[in-house]
Design a protein with these regions (language model features):
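RNA pseudouridine synthases
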Residues: 2-208
Length: 208
């Protein structure tokens, strides 16, 4: 795990009493500090000695990885979560995804949320010409002899529970790997799984 300090960015406000971080949440970790059950799970506190009252802004599920923002500032967390900020994901799906499926994702598909039907909002979706340069995942995803896979980019301004996995399943292509690479103007860049980078603030994510 490496710790990289970035140059200060333009400030969202003058409050310097809070601390902010961006991290690469590894596969297999929960986006929280306190377990919800007695079952042993990997938690964010194992990655870094975060200050008290640090909270994740949004979540990535256990099987997903990539960019996650953390802060001790509840107001900033609320502001970011309340805005329609783009979140971009690189998604590896099972099979050779079709143009028809890409178009359906762009237009919105019907998925299930808490037992109710939900129509996803229109989003940006495109097929990536080449496999993205991402850190290798520790656990093998699938034997390549089982057929082709495709990489796509999906950019949303909403975030329902396991939404992208449900969206790709709705168009006939199961998600094999899901990596969040951008939130607003904050990108994961060349971070590695488990890496933590302190930030001045997250005002860049609020632009636009």
């Amino acid at each position: 795990m490496s710790l990289n300090h970035q140059e200060p960015a333009a400030t969202f406000d003058d409050d310097t009493s809070h601390q902010h971080f961006k991290i690469y949440k590894p596969y297999g970790f929960l986006s929280q500090f306190v377990p919800e059950t007695r079952k042993r799970k990997k938690l964010l506190g194992e990655l870094f000695h975060f200050p008290d009252k640090t909270m994740a802004i949004g979540r990535l599920d256990h099987d997903s990885e990539g960019l996650l923002l953390l802060t001790t500032d509840g107001m900033m967390s609320h502001l970011i979560r309340s805005k329609s900020i783009e979140k971009e994901y690189y998604v590896q799906v099972d099979g050779d995804i079709s143009d028809t499926a890409i178009t359906a994702l762009q237009q919105g598909v019907e998925i299930g949320i808490n037992g109710e039907k939900y129509q996803t909002l229109p989003c940006k979706a495109l097929r990536l010409a080449d496999e993205p340069s991402l850190p290798a995942r520790g656990r093998k995803i699938r034997d390549p002899r089982h057929g082709p896979t495709s990489w796509i980019s999906i950019t949303l301004c909403e975030g329902k529970n396991r939404q992208i996995r449900k969206m790709t399943a709705a168009v006939g292509f199961a998600t094999l790997r899901l990596v969040r690479v951008r939130i607003g103007n904050i990108a994961i860049d060349a971070m590695q799984p488990g890496e933590v980078q302190p930030q001045t603030n997250f005002n860049a994510a609020l632009i636009g």
